[in-house]
């Protein structure tokens, strides 16, 4: 019976820290979603899904494709306004950090052949065409004033603690203190990037 009360007390402590972290994690996700919408609409307008998700999915195997998550979480119905609301945090990770190219190999080859046929293939044009095949992530392309490597590291830590909180796992005082700082830093970076777009500093 004594052991039972000890376990019960520790469960209460873990629950306390989880409840304290949950609003901050929710705030992080909300601000992240706002930043992504803002950056994608600014760069791609209403075609942002075809310009990003479709190209990212090309790099992923069938079980990890983002559109599969969207279809499952939205009961088969989503649009440009609601798509991100159906993302899980792990989906955001794939969306932000998976590297993809703007054009397929077939497009690149066809473009080179067309330039060659029209006798306009020089070193500059060849370099320009090939550069379009370079793979870059959403974070690298569109998220302003944020170092991709640093943000990816912070994101992984938030994903880890988020899973512990959501699944009722042990959350200690050390977890709470460390991740409060991680989340605060991440939110600050996101807000700074949003401010760039709000002020049209791009």
Task: Annotate each language-model stretch with its function.
Residues 1-160, 164-202:
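Amphipathic alpha-helical interface elements
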């Amino acid at each position: 019976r004594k052991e039972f009360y000890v376990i019960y007390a520790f469960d209460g402590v873990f629950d306390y820290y989880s409840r304290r972290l949950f609003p901050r994690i929710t705030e992080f996700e909300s601000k992240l979603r706002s930043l992504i919408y803002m950056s994608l609409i600014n760069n791609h307008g209403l075609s942002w899904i075809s310009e990003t998700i479709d190209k990212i999915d090309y790099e992923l195997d069938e079980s990890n494709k983002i559109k599969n998550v969207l279809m499952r979480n939205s009961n088969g119905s989503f649009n440009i306004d609601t798509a991100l609301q159906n993302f899980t945090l792990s989906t955001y990770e794939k969306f932000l950090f998976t590297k993809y190219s703007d054009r397929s190999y077939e497009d690149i080859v066809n473009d080179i052949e067309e330039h060659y046929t029209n006798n306009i293939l020089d070193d500059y044009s060849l370099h320009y065409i090939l550069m379009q095949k370079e793979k870059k992530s959403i974070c690298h392309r569109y998220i302003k004033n944020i170092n991709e490597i640093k943000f990816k590291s912070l994101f992984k830590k938030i994903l880890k603690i988020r899973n512990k909180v959501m699944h009722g796992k042990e959350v200690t005082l050390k977890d709470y203190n460390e991740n409060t700082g991680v989340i605060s830093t991440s939110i600050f970076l996101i807000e700074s990037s949003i401010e760039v777009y709000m002020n049209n500093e791009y």
